[in-house]
Amino acid sequence: MELQIGRVIKPHGVRGEVVVDPTTDTPELRFATGEVLKGKQAGKELSLTVRSFRPHQGRLLVTFEEIADRTAAESLRGVRFFAAPVHDEDDDGFYDHELEGLTAYLLAPGTDLKGDEIQLGDLVGEVVAVEHTPAGQLLVILIDAESQLPTAGKEVLVPFRHQIVPVVDLEEEILVLTPPEGLLELS
């Protein structure tokens, strides 16, 4: 799976520079001099080698080895750049697409989180989206229709905090919740 890391907005100047709206946390790595970027535009794929880049008004100004003038730069308008995700082994972060689709369970009563085996409790539902707010990430969980919760069949927002979501297992496609009382009853 590849993630979009940026999109060409428009040409800038007459020497082939383009304005790129970066959608990555590490534009200085993704758009570094010499990097070969994979781009897509109207179903066509292309590769471009970064000659230089610099920050400009919250975006990037990028020049490519293959683009010599404004006319050539104009043809790049709308190109979306993609790259493989970079996983940091020390980082507990997750990409949204990794969390979406996971099945959420409550932690079984009496289960110790420090043990090797996590016992699953009642099925809660499925993560259908991740929302990013100034206060942090929220998981949008569609409560299972068979649930005994008053919010059965509805979406609830769950703060994505270790205290509330102590276990995320991407291999098993599950996450475990230890919500404060009443959280799953709010819709």
Swiss-Prot record:
InterPro entries xrefs: PRC_barrel-like_sf (IPR011033), PRC_RimM (IPR056792), RimM (IPR011961), RimM_N (IPR002676), RimM_N_sf (IPR036976), Transl_B-barrel_sf (IPR009000)
Residues of the PRC barrel domain: 91-183
Compartments it resides in: Cytoplasm
GO cellular component: cytoplasm; ribosome
Principal localisation: cytoplasm
Record's subunit section: Binds ribosomal protein uS19.
Record comment regarding domains: The PRC barrel domain binds ribosomal protein uS19.
Family: Belongs to the RimM family.
Protein name as it appears in the record: Ribosome maturation factor RimM
Source species: Corynebacterium jeikeium (strain K411)
